[in-house]
Amino acid sequence: MAAPDEPHRPGAGVRSAVVVVPCDPLQPTLDFFTRRLGFRVDAIFPADAPMIAELSGHGLGLRLQPGGELDGEQPGAHLRLRLRCDDPTTVAGGDRELVAPNGTRVELVEADPGVVLPPEQPELVVTHARDGETWGTGRAGMQYRDVIPGRQGGRFIGSHIRIPTAGPVPDYVHYHQVRFQMIYCHKGWVRVVYEDQGEPLLMEAGDCVLQPPEIRHRVLESGDGLEVVELGCPADHETRAEHEISLPTGRLLPERHFGGQRFVYHDASEAEWRPWRVPGFECREIGIGAATDGLAGVRVARPAGADHTPRTTHDAEFVFGFVLAGTCTLECEGRVPERMEEGDTFVVPRHLEYALIGCSPDFELLDVTLPEDVPLT
């Protein structure tokens, strides 16, 4: 029994949970779950005329009990179960969806389908922070602004994320099933911890991380006015909680690979500037190209003697820009030029002629591309 002054923990005292599956009669549905899907009987009663059975299997508990029809439907018609399988085609003779005698639908799905990458659907996308795009509340109470509406057909997601007030972040250890994911700290600071990367990191404005596939991590706390930019591929990917690994792990393994990629922490205070891919501009290289074997490149670009880029096209999968500071005008073929300010974003599809003109001396652009090397045409 807990001490009187000990706070009550939600769920304290609960031993297990089961799903109630209404069925009448019992036997056909019992046979379905035990003989076809491999559940085992844990309890059945009364012995002389069984009406209730408790089953377990595959991490799930079921309680089969009498339930009458509703509006002429079978008692379990509104219940749907999903069984995650190594190979769904080998479980029930190739069937991927089954219907139990009580009407319950059972879906057989892949336990680990991997990253599903939608086909490319490139399109020009421009967003303006001044237009007052809606901020929604996402995971762990953070506020999200979608900077790639339409998501390029589901291939890419871009989020401008903010946490207005300082303090602990109600996050938990988790990981993402992705092809590519990066976070750039635009304003404020945030403390995060990553699997096998030593003690928690303090990310400040200008810093950036590559989160390789399935690396366990957790956001710990943030300062006032935190803003980060997060880009991921594909757009629809699973974020899974990690219940076994605690962070930090006590290990520092900077060369460890996660899904073929290495973790990157870019400290802006130690960055070196070099020529960008267009003349008259320079950039600080984040280091993501080397860590992803050329899959993606991330840089911060700024003027270095020029105030515009030449009109050009590219043949890359993805070219994204987020205005970090200053102003410019985005010119795109067949579109009215648009003034771009801090927080504004663009995605330019392949083979569309474009240029950035009238760049202010303090102009800075977060430049994200897939692949790292952008073929200009």
Task: Please place each PLM-identified region on the residue numbering.
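N-terminal beta-strand motif that seeds the catalytic metal site of vicinal oxygen chelate
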Residues: 2-30, 78-81, 109-136, 141, ...
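Vicinal oxygen chelate
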Residues: 15-25, 53-60, 67-104, 178-186, ...
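A short beta-loop-beta micro-motif enriched in histidine and acidic residues
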Residues: 16, 48-50, 152-156, 167-182, ...
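Conserved short beta-strand elements that form part of the metal-binding/catalytic scaffold
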Residues: 40-77, 105-110, 149-151, 155-165, ...
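Short histidine-centered beta-strand/loop micro-motifs
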Residues: 44-45, 72-74, 170-177, 194, ...
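Short acidic-glycine-tyrosine-enriched beta hairpin
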Residues: 147, 196-214, 333-353
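Short, conserved beta-strand element in jelly-roll/cupin
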Residues: 161-164, 175-192, 231-234, 300-304, ...
